């Protein structure tokens, strides 16, 4: 997308920047895209269409002319242009509880990004919401993997908190499958390998995602996976392995209390990857998140979600 043109100055999204932190250069996204493509190219389905099987049972080469649900939300006609920090704001890519994700680009039109705009007023008086946002930013800034979204910048204004990230031009994997029914085995294997690579990287770094689903798996222009939306992500002690006895007795409240498994350390973490907050999306959630409020192991929750995603890739 090129830089928009028109008479007059650009309208500012907000007049006061309170804080601005640069993490990575958005220009690096081109190199990251090439890296993903090189890793995906070895002995697997070419990227021209992901080997998708359409209604006629053959590879339709991509979306088959269909539009995503985001496409329908784009309004015709020209809107007043606004800026956020050093970026021009474009169309809405998605919406959440606290704000929107907008397409953005540098004022010279050279670099596209995704900007998660969180309205300060939407946070209300709940004291846990703002730390959760800062935790997401803290987790993202320490990640560097070709199949995990890259954080570029954090900008705080008097009205919004903006998280500027790598833009995935291929949209959601959910939309891709919705429009094409299912994938051929080779294409599904390639995408699932990328997902597992990213999740394995997170777990080695002591991070669980806790909301893995098709809607949070984006595609770059070459149809390679980018894991995104770390709003429910949390950290854990990666080197503290729990024994089978502990994992087997997590629903036994007396055992949990006796072993002090419900206690947290000075960083707010329990033993190993034990967690208690129920979160994520019901269709992808592990049973222990749905049937009880007991402690659970975070990594296994991610593994379960990966299994659901694999089934979704293969079943019509």
Predicted features and spans:
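Activation segment signature within eukaryotic-like protein kinase domains
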Residues: 191-192
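Conserved N-lobe beta3->alphaC-helix segment of eukaryotic protein kinase catalytic domains
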Residues: 112, 117-143
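A conserved loop-to-beta-strand element in the N-lobe of protein kinase catalytic cores
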Residues: 149, 158-166, 174-175
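Intrinsically disordered, low-complexity regulatory segments that flank or precede the catalytic domain
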Residues: 1-84
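Protein kinase glycine-rich loop
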Residues: 89-97, 101
């Amino acid at each position: 997308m090129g830089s928009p043109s028109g008479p007059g100055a650009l309208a500012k999204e907000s007049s006061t920047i309170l804080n601005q932190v640069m993490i990575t250069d958005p220009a690096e996204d081109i190199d990251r895209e090439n890296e993903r493509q090189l890793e995906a190219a070895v002995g697997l389905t070419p990227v021209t269409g992901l080997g998708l099987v359409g209604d006629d049972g053959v590879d339709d080469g991509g979306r088959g002319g269909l539009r995503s649900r985001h496409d329908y939300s784009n309004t015709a006609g020209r809107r007043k242009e606004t800026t956020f920090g050093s970026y021009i704001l474009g169309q809405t890519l998605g919406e959440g509880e606290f704000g929107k994700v907008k397409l953005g680009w540098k004022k010279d039109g050279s670099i596209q990004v995704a900007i998660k705009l969180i309205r300060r007023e939407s946070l209300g008086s709940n004291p846990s919401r703002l730390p959760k946002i800062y935790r997401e930013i803290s987790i993202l800034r320490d990640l560097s993997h070709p199949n995990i979204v890259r954080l570029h910048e954090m900008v705080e204004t008097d009205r919004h908190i903006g998280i500027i990230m790598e833009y995935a031009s291929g949209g959601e994997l959910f939309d891709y499958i919705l429009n094409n029914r299912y994938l051929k085995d080779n294409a599904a294997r390639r995408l699932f390998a990328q997902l597992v690579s990213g999740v394995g990287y997170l777990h080695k770094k002591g991070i669980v995602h806790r909301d893995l689903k098709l809607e949070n798996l984006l595609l770059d222009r070459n149809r390679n996976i980018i894991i995104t939306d770390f709003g429910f992500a949390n950290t854990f002690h990666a080197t503290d392995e729990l024994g089978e006895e502990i994992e087997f007795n997590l629903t036994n409240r007396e055992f949990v209390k006796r072993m002090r498994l419900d206690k947290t350390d000075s960083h707010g973490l329990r033993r190993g990857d034990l967690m208690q907050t129920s979160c994520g999306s019901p269709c992808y959630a592990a049973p222990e998140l749905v049937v009880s409020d007991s402690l659970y192991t975070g990594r296994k929750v991610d593994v379960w979600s990966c299994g659901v995603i694999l089934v979704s890739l293969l079943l019509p």
